């Protein structure tokens, strides 16, 4: 048994998280009250990864919901799937973190963290052999960013050999809630670089662009954005939840995707993109899906993969299709886009196929890319951080909670190091003995 315990922290984390549970409950044939209504044996075969079967026969998510204010919890609890979660697993404070990372990490969050760890411990005790944790949170606020990263460092101490995955929503200038987002995000990334094994970077800006450009939604709501995120999360976790051939657990995914321990920030993508409530009216072929997967417009992260190179890629196809066709299409796209893959990692594209399509679609595909272009996000946040930090703007909110300026300086330099590491591997060619090949490659490029 390889269970995963899911934690959702803060307002954003809880909204994305509860949407994720709606989607996967539906895929596994579990209704909002936790009763199995499905018809396929494969739906339950590996449902234990995310669901615990209670003595009453109900399926209960292995999820812990936390926030520093009661508001979000109330809306999850009163939502359609509110009664699905175990009532003891709602953990909330009263004061809120007020978008202040220091409050989430050092003061308010630190007071609540032991309670949360107890709840998580209980969840882990109900597992036979836990493979790891996944967390949904945003990096721009106080609770998800500050308290979320505090929890991650606590797990690292308590479960050092378990995989830690996060779905982290990056702040973006176009969709900004607060002026201190660059501070909160930089401090969070400083933690994530050291303490997580896999981080899926989800970017509100990219989600907005997809909603406006591709889905033609005139004014997208957070509900529309969360729909896109949940489709991607469902796709990324397909291999873990259904019998499939490859990347059947978090550790295998990490081994295939992370060539250097610090470079574990992935760009997710999804095809075909559909808006909420509209079923897909077009027939899709495997070649369509493959084309869309590698299209910059389908990335959930606001950076252009054509500005960098892929270190590794994993693609998960769902639906009735032949493995042979999938392999051929993936092979041809690799050849077509060979300059965008580093040549010093051979066979750096992994493909998995799962027979069960997502609800409402005939077939779909999910993309996970470890591309050096992700440095664009970090650069963007770093520039905004430096502009404010140079003037020491808003710093008193953080020092007032007991933080030191030194911590800001460290976080800033760690993020800049991360950017230069990505840049270094982007420019790296095969060893010098391959000079001849490189010349040939450049000549082709010039032609």
Swiss-Prot record:
Binding residues for Mg(2+): 69
Residues binding GTP, per UniProt: 11, 69, 138, 142-144, 204, 226
Pfam family, one: Tubulin
Species lineage: Eukaryota, Metazoa, Spiralia, Lophotrochozoa, Mollusca
One Gene Ontology cellular component annotation held by this UniProt entry: microtubule
Protein name: Tubulin beta chain
Source organism: Enteroctopus dofleini
Segments of this protein annotated with the region Disordered: 424-447
Keywords: Cytoplasm, Cytoskeleton, GTP-binding, Magnesium, Metal-binding, Microtubule, Nucleotide-binding
InterPro entries with a match to the protein in the record: Beta-tubulin_BS (IPR013838), Beta_tubulin (IPR002453), Tub_FtsZ_C (IPR008280), Tubulin (IPR000217), Tubulin/FtsZ-like_C (IPR037103), Tubulin/FtsZ_2-layer-sand-dom (IPR018316), Tubulin/FtsZ_GTPase_sf (IPR036525), Tubulin_C (IPR023123)
Sequence similarity: Belongs to the tubulin family.
Tissue/organ expression: Lens specific.
